[in-house]
């Protein structure tokens, strides 16, 4: 296992500007490690169709920690139990190490953006929250952050465009989560339940939007956007539709080759995603979230949330 950790640390160090300011942290549990560093903020590593393997965080002193989940590196048997070496040490999963290396390459881009003062923290999410429906600016900043990191990661390592199964996994899970949120609200449709259903919808969409950012990054600069086999999927038509082209139009204009891109251009792009694309995507999935003179209003416009793989 030690050799695997050293390989990952070496990969990380080669991809950031100032390796001495970046530490690789191997955590027994990613969620608890993040929460210890971010007191009072809920964090769950279960995300969409899987589990988050890593998180990059800037410390108060300016140093950066890339935290990874150690369980991804352990070989397991058919029953999900960890395998051990004759010496009683956890057995390293070579497949897990290869996948974690891809994750490290992605997280290194986040670390570099932090070092060049152009990462998520620089978007001043809190200062812009009042200009948009709750969470829209924050999720827009997240979309842009993940898009830039994934595109640059692809320059260091091969990234394949999404397959039909990849898309069905993500959109099927999205449909299930939206249906569950709607069902909880319909079972008890009182004013207090509005905040709950809104949170459930945003949580479901956040994982989906992250995948959209990855996919757009993988297709950047290509004339062929997605194949007909994906565009013709019922779930794609239902949840994505024209929002795919809309997100591409915005993100294609974002300067990404330099991870220290001008702050003004990045904030302009975030504002466009928050103002135009997030509401468009919510509407496509069946919801509206608007700011009125009396406050915020959240509407459910569709109660059909398919999840069947078709």
Question: Which residue stretches match the model-derived regions?
Answer:
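Zn2+-dependent metallopeptidase catalytic core
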Residues: 1-26
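Short, flexible loop/turn elements at secondary-structure junctions
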Residues: 28-30, 70-72, 109, 117
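Extended, Lys/Arg-enriched charged tracts that mediate electrostatic binding to polyanionic substrates
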Residues: 31-46
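Active-site scaffold of zinc-dependent metalloenzymes
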Residues: 42-101, 114, 308-310
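Post-HEXXH active-site segment of zinc metalloproteases
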Residues: 94-99, 114-146
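Active-site His/Glu-centered metal-binding helix of metallohydrolases
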Residues: 104-113
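Short helix/loop segments within enzyme catalytic domains
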Residues: 151-180
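Pan-zinc metallopeptidase signature
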Residues: 170-310
């Amino acid at each position: 296992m030690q050799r695997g950790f050293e390989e990952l640390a070496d990969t990380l160090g080669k991809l950031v500007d100032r390796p001495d300011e970046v530490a690789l942290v191997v955590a027994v549990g990613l969620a608890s490690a993040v929460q210890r560093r971010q007191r009072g903020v809920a964090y769950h590593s279960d995300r969409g169709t899987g589990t988050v393997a890593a998180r990059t965080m800037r410390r108060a002193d300016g140093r950066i920690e890339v935290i990874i989940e150690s369980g991804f590196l352990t070989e397991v048997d058919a029953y999900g139990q960890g395998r051990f070496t004759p010496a009683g040490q956890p057995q390293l999963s070579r497949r897990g190490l290869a996948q974690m290396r891809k994750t490290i390459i992605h997280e290194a881009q986040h670390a570099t953006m932090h070092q060049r003062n152009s990462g998520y923290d620089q978007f001043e999410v809190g200062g812009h929250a009042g200009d948009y429906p709750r969470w829209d600016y924050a999720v827009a900043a997240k979309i842009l952050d993940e898009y830039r990191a994934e595109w640059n990661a692809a320059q260091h390592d091969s990234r394949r465009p999404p397959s039909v199964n990849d898309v069905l996994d993500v959109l099927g899970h999205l449909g299930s989560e939206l249906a569950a949120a709607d069902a909880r609200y319909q079972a008890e449709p009182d004013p207090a339940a509005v905040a709950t259903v809104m949170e459930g919808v945003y949580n479901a969409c956040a994982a989906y939007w992250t995948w959209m950012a990855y996919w757009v990054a993988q297709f950047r600069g290509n004339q062929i956007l997605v194949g007909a086999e994906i565009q013709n999927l019922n779930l794609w038509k239902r949840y994505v539709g024209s929002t795919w082209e809309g997100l591409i139009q915005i993100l294609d204009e974002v300067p990404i080759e330099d991870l220290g891109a001008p702050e003004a251009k990045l904030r302009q792009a975030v504002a466009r995603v928050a103002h135009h694309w997030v509401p468009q995507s919510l509407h496509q999935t069946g919801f509206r979230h608007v700011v009125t003179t009396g406050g915020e209003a959240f509407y459910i416009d569709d109660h059909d949330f398919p999840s069947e793989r078709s």
